[in-house]
């Protein structure tokens, strides 16, 4: 079928022979002139500081595994590339595969031992879970729900920048959902905390996996109600109202932050609405 993804997440068993493998460490992937996927049996014969191996899915019908390495060792003719590089450039199906593999690799690294009794954890075949054989504790891959919101005021949008951003880039507001609150409550609270304004008329737009390292971004538009911008100390370097015809440098095209902005621009101008990547 036209447009069908070449990547499908899954759990091919590590007991079977063959397939492709990704080498991962600290949100970086090993690559050579042929790419990121290596013949599995060949790469496993190299002297690698292996922590864990997990099946992660299928690429063009072939099983794919991830090797989580203890450190990013150097191998002749190969180099390590950061995950963010693949978000910004190149094949989106490939980025989805790498994002999933990175999250599984990090989960495997962080859950080698039981947090309750210290026993070495064991991966299970029937589902994606690490289980302690001593006390029975289960650990599933971590997923952190986060709201991300574009605050609007007619032909103006409220954008902010964190000290961690690329210089000059402004984006939407975002924050993690706390225990006991709904995503909608999180939107109102985070906007108030980060920039000191009140919002209403929330509209859910869509969601996007964000593997940096394990967020699920839940995107909203919200209308400004009241208040003056007061940036949160240590979190927000600057925040401003920007006219739609005079926007600052914006986030990457593939991000949900950029989609929220582009969607609002399209709606105000009557243009065709963009499709959220992923």
Swiss-Prot record:
InterPro entries, sorted: NAD-cap_RNA_hydrolase_NudC, NADH_PPase-like_N, NudC-like_C, NUDIX_hydrolase-like_dom_sf, NUDIX_hydrolase_CS, NUDIX_hydrolase_dom, RNA_Hydrolase_NudC, Znr_NADH_PPase
Keywords on record: Hydrolase, Magnesium, Manganese, Metal-binding, NAD, Zinc
Binding-site positions, substrate: 84, 127, 140, 208-215, 257
GO cellular component, one term: cytosol
CDD domains found in the cross-reference section: NUDIX_NADH_pyrophosphatase_Nudt13
Gene3D superfamilies, per database record: 3.90.79.20, Nucleoside Triphosphate Pyrophosphohydrolase (3.90.79.10)
Binding site for a divalent metal cation 1: 174, 194, 235
Keyword Zinc found: yes
PROSITE patterns attached to this UniProt entry: NUDIX, NUDIX_BOX
Residues at which Zn(2+) binds: 114, 117, 132, 135
EC number(s) per entry: 3.6.1.-, 3.6.1.22
Oligomeric and partner information: Homodimer.
Name listed for the protein in its UniProt record: NAD-capped RNA hydrolase NudC
Species of the source: Pseudomonas aeruginosa (strain UCBPP-PA14)
């Amino acid at each position: 079928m036209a447009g069908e993804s070449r990547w499908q997440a899954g759990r091919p068993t590590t007991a079977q022979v063959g397939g492709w493998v990704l080498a991962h460490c600290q949100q970086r992937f090993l690559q050579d002139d042929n790419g990121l996927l290596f013949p599995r049996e060949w790469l496993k014969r190299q002297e690698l500081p292996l922590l864990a191996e997990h099946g992660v899915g299928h690429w063009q019908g072939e099983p794919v595994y991830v090797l989580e390495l203890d450190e990013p060792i150097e191998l002749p003719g190969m180099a390590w590339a950061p995950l963010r590089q693949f978000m910004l450039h190149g094949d989106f199906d490939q980025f989805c595969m790498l994002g999933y593999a990175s999250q599984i690799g990090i989960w495997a690294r962080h859950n080698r031992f039981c947090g309750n009794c210290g026993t070495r954890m064991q991966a299970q075949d029937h589902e994606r879970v690490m289980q302690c054989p001593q006390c029975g504790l289960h650990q599933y891959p971590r997923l952190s729900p986060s709201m991300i919101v574009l605050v609007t005021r007619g032909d103006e949008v409220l954008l902010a920048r964190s000290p961690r951003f690329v210089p000059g880039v402004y984006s939407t507001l975002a924050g993690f959902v706390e225990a006991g609150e709904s995503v909608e409550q999180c939107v109102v609270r985070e906007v108030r905390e980060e920039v000191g304004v009140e919002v209403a008329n929330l509209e859910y737009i869509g969601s996007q996996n964000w593997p940096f390292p394990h967020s699920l971004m839940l995107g909203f538009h919200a209308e400004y109600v009241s208040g003056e911008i007061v940036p949160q100390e240590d979190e927000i370097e600057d925040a401003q109202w920007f006219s739609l015809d005079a926007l600052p440098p914006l986030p990457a095209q593939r991000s949900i932050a950029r989609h929220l902005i582009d969607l609002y621009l399209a709606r105000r101008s009557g243009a065709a609405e963009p499709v959220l990547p992923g």
